[in-house]
Amino acid sequence: MKITGIYKILNIITNKSYIGQSLDVKDRIRRHKYNLNRGKHSNPHLQKSYIKYGTDNFKYEILYQFDVNGLSKDDICNHLNIKEIEMIILFDSFNNGYNLTTGGDRHYIVSDATKIKLSESHKG
């Protein structure tokens, strides 16, 4: 079963994090591990740290997941963008971590209508 959401890669020695988003978090984490182990990760700061501290000093965690049933792909991506930005701020992973951007890079603009839908979907 696919999990859509936000994940964190944490260096347990330095407490630095990388925050990411995915429509399939488990597969995305698997691909991060594969590329890091091969020394071919697209994020040079994360790769360098991984080589220095070793695989045993990195923890992978799903921070946030949500039910995508009934949502359009645009709504899903907008929601992921918003949550990714929130988590990057929360864990300070742009200024003091491995994120190379401030997040929300799925190239979708969060419309007011989408913001209302997302807000309503999270009310009890």
Predicted regions located by residue number:
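Structure-specific nucleic-acid interaction/processing domains
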Residues: 1-117
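Short, intrinsically disordered, charge-balanced linker/junction segments flanking boundaries
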Residues: 119-124
